Amino acid sequence: TPHVQGIMVEYPMVQARQCVVVSDAMPLDQAACVEPLAIALHAVARAGNLLGKRVFVSGAGPVGCLIAAVARLNGAASVAISDMEAFPLSVAVRLGADAAFKAADPALADLANGCEACFEASGSVGGMNTCLRSAAPGGTIVHVGFLGEEEVAYPINTMVIRKEVT
């Protein structure tokens, strides 16, 4: 099934084979969360044990907010999240994030080298770089966001030699 970018619209156009019939017994607001929650659960599982760990999430869309919630439910000591918009950050806080930062907030620098698990859910190169800066040495970065067809250069020396991130 091809990836569809930008599905957060009132009336998305998708192919019939991408649709699933939902029981009338399931409320639509819950049904709408199934797919992003599945992604969040998978991402958090990829990060390993989060008990007592500091977590950072770049991107407070549906997937990023649900990653924050699942990380909190999996015992993360703290969960910080960033986004370009204020409203999704407020949702993330309601779902369990301890700290929410606008992407341009200089306070994001305080996370540098301090998060044992980072999740890139914004689909942006800037978000990827913020995760890399925020990751503690030996930490884990789980890349969830879709960057489209753009070629991205990962700073391998920083990731492997200086930080030893996985």
Model-assigned labels for residue ranges:
Residues 102, 120, 143:
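Redox-cofactor binding/interface segments in oxidoreductases and associated redox assembly factors
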Residues 109-118:
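A short acidic, Gly/Pro-enriched loop at the edge of an enzyme's catalytic core
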Residues 1-19:
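Glycine-rich phosphate/adenylate-binding loop and adjacent beta-alpha elements
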Residues 18-28, 113, 164:
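Glycine/charged-rich beta-loop-alpha catalytic/anionic-binding loops adjacent to active sites
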Residues 26-105:
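Mid-domain Rossmann-like dinucleotide-binding core that forms the NAD(H)/NADP(H) cofactor-binding site
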Residues 7-8, 84-91, 150-156:
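Short, glycine/polar-rich helix-capping loops at beta-to-alpha or helix-loop-helix junctions
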Residues 125-166:
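Glycine-rich phosphate-binding loop and adjacent beta-alpha segment
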